Amino acid sequence: MYLFHLCLVFACVPCPTFQASKLCLGWLWGMDIDPYKEFGSSYQLLNFLPLDFFPDLNALVDTATALYEEELTGREHCSPHHTAIRQALVCWDELTKLIAWMSSNITSEQVRTIIVNHVNDTWGLKVRQSLWFHLSCLTFGQHTVQEFLVSFGVWIRTPAPYRPPNAPILSTLPEHTVIRRRGGARASRSPRRRTPSPRRRRSQSPRRRRSQSPSANC
């Protein structure tokens, strides 16, 4: 898998998986690559969130599968967020296989526990952050997630006596509603708002009676 990503990076192929390939290789080599820069965010902003803020990996994987299984398993490029979710799931699957192989070949239970805890605290946390970020961008909108991260970063760095008691909450609804059409296609449209039509003002002057024509009296 890493050979595939390595070829993409060295060949500078302009494809949607280019950034995700640099992400996977960055984790492998320890390079200072921030995969959130192209989305207007950063590792630093995500690290302001506490560790227990991010849901469990199984819950995130189940959510991604339930909402976007068709897009993730298809061959079409839907968005950079879908591509990042794909690569995060692939990286975590490879790490899970590595842990399973180590568990079956290492006899010491203490060593196995240390390895599993280390993977969960390092790579596992990065996958949790990545899945949460991109799922939230697809659910609430990228701009809303950016504002939330900045607001939370300001709140957590402000001394307790000078900040509100409650932290910001990511609760804003998305700007565009995604509607699934027949045949699997999706269309996004903004919610319509009905504006009341102005009522016609009735004239205050008395109504004039129509004068009958002379021919009507004949």
Swiss-Prot record:
One of its GO terms (biological process) is symbiont entry into host cell. Residues 1-19 form the signal peptide. Phosphorylated. Cleaved by host furin. The keyword Secreted applies. Keywords: Disulfide bond, Host nucleus, Host-virus interaction, Repeat, Secreted, Signal, Viral immunoevasion. Its main location: secreted. Sequence repeats lie at residues 190-196, 197-204, 205-212. Residues 190-218 form a propeptide. It is found in: Secreted; Host nucleus. GO terms for molecular function: DNA binding; RNA binding; structural molecule activity. Residues 180-218 are annotated as: Disordered. It holds the Pfam family Hep_core_N. This is External core antigen. It comes from Woodchuck hepatitis B virus (isolate 59) (WHV).
